[in-house]
Structure formats: C-alpha cells, structure tokens
C-alpha cells in the first residue's frame, strides 16, 4: 500500500535568509490531481510547529487510494523561527515580524514579509485551509477558532472548546477567508506529558475535516467528534510580576472546566521563593483553554492562562 505521504511530490521555493545560508527553503508536498484541494499548514509560529506537523504526517499514512481530492502540506512554514523554537524569525529588521499578521505578504519586504508572499499563492488556490498552531514549547492548548461560513470544519476538528475567531488583519486564515476559502485555526496540543494524545487527536480531527468535503474517502465514516463546548470571548491571565511559576493544575486540566476559586498556579520570588501571586479560577465555570503546565521562570506580564466562560 502506497501512502499519501509516500506519494507527496515535494517542491520548494527559496527565500533570502541570513548571511551564512543566503537562502532558506520553504518546502511543501502535494498529492492528488483533481477535485477539492485542502492545504494544511503547520509552524506558522516556530515554537508551535512540531506537534502539528506530526499530526499532518499521521493523516498522510492513509493509502493514497483514499485521496479523492487534492492535498497540499506545509510541515514547517517558518523555518528560521522553528530552528530556535521561537514564535517569529530572528532575522527580520529592524524588529521581529509575526508571520500570522502580514498576509498576503510582500516579496520585497523583510524575510517574514517575503515568506508570507510565497505562501499566499499556496493558500489562494485552495478550497479548504487549516492552519494548525497548537500550544508550543511553553504551553498546551485545547481549542479551535471558528470562522463564519466554516462552522462544520471547526466542529469536525474535534477540539474540546470552540471560540469565534477574531478578524485579525493580516492573519493567514483571515486572508484565506477573504478569498472565499473554508478555513479553521487549530490551537490544540503542545509540549507536555500528553503531547502525543493531543497529536493523535488532531490527526483524527483532520480525518473528519477532509472526509466531509470529499477530499478523503474512508472505508467507513470517521467517528463523530465529541461536541465541543462553545465559549465566550477569551481572557488572558498574565503575571503581575516576574518570578518562578509553579503550576497547581497540570496538563490534564487543559480542555476541561474548573469551578470558581480553584487554585491554578502561583508565582514565587526568584530570590526568596516568597509567594507573590496566586492564580485562581474567576468564573463559576472556567474553561481552561491554554495553560503553562510546567515549573518555569517567567517575566512580569507573561501570558500564563487563557480562559473563557461557556457561552
């Protein structure tokens, strides 16, 4: 059996990079010749990519005979950011640029502007675009962003929580949606002891997302996704002061609801370990959408949790 992955035809474009390398490749694989096209993108932010890329590769272990549409995969959209496990590329001048804010890009701009300019045509000829973010090197997430007109796509992805996507100027999915493309933004997974659980769950979600529009034919329809909990606008909880962050709730809690007053974690003084800040769940039902699951040193103002109320 030849798999979709084994059938991918790899292509690349070369983008001006740092002095030692001169050019950085953007590689993408394509399979299928006719029908509805889905483009799956991982690593728009360099600290989020590996888990999402693995989920896409898991999807691609299906037999190529099951591919009834066309598939394009970009496993690492932002290579210079990925190699240092940072959100953005380190060579933009004079300031770092968020790739997910500059679409459709500028081929005469900074490195990231140019990168967006080369990715944009790989989006514009698609019927479905799924931008997989996830948690990353420092957090774990459990939600998908839903766009008007693409509600079923978001539901099929099977995240514990669904939030309405903001209209983010320059965003990859915002750009795709402006072209009439079905889109979803996945924020599921990240570094934790459960990273493979979330990776496999994302792969199952991608199966459903490609089965519904007829891109992937399976011997039997995939199991329906568990109904996600709709949540209201998300709220960021940040560190009021820098120090040592010690989580009370660990990775098993992301994607669940905890009651008001639940201790979530605390910040200790870097020098004396005195308790400086305690995070507690503020709502009667507090949806845990993003969290730091590990002990770490953080700066004041650092994002620690993303929470919401069930809608």
Residue ranges and their predicted role:
Residues 1-311:
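Structured catalytic-domain cores with a bias toward divalent-metal coordination
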């Amino acid at each position: 059996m030849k798999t979709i992955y084994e059938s991918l035809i790899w292509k690349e474009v070369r983008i001006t990079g740092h002095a030692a390398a001169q050019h950085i490749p953007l590689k993408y694989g394509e399979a299928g010749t006719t029908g509805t096209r889905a483009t799956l993108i991982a690593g728009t932010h360099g600290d989020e990519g590996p888990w999402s890329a693995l989920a896409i590769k898991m999807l691609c272990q299906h037999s190529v005979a099951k591919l009834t549409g066309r598939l394009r995969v970009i496993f690492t959209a932002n290579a210079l950011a990925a190699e240092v496990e940072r959100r953005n590329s380190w060579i933009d001048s004079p300031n770092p640029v968020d790739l997910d804010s500059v679409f459709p890009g500028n081929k005469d701009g900074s490195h990231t502007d140019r990168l967006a300019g080369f990715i944009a045509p790989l989006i514009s000829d698609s019927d479905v675009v799924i931008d997989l973010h996830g948690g990353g090197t420092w957090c774990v997430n459990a939600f998908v962003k839903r766009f008007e007109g693409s509600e079923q796509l978001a539901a099929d992805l099977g995240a514990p929580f669904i939030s309405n996507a903001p209209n983010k100027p320059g965003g990859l999915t915002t750009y795709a949606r402006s072209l009439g493309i079905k889109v979803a933004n996945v924020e599921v997974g990240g570094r934790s002891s459960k990273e493979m659980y979330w990776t496999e769950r994302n792969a199952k979600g991608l199966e459903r997302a490609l089965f519904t529009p007829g891109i992937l034919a399976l011997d039997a329809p995939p199991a329906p996704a568990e109904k996600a909990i709709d949540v209201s606008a998300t709220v960021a909880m940040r560190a009021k002061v820098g120090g040592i962050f010690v989580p009370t709730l660990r990775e098993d809690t992301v994607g669940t609801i905890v009651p008001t007053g639940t201790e979530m974690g605390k910040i200790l003084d870097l020098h004396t370990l005195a308790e400086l800040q305690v995070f507690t769940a503020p709502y009667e039902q507090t949806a845990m959408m993003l969290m730091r699951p590990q002990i770490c040193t953080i700066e004041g103002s650092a994002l620690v949790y993303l929470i919401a109320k069930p809608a």
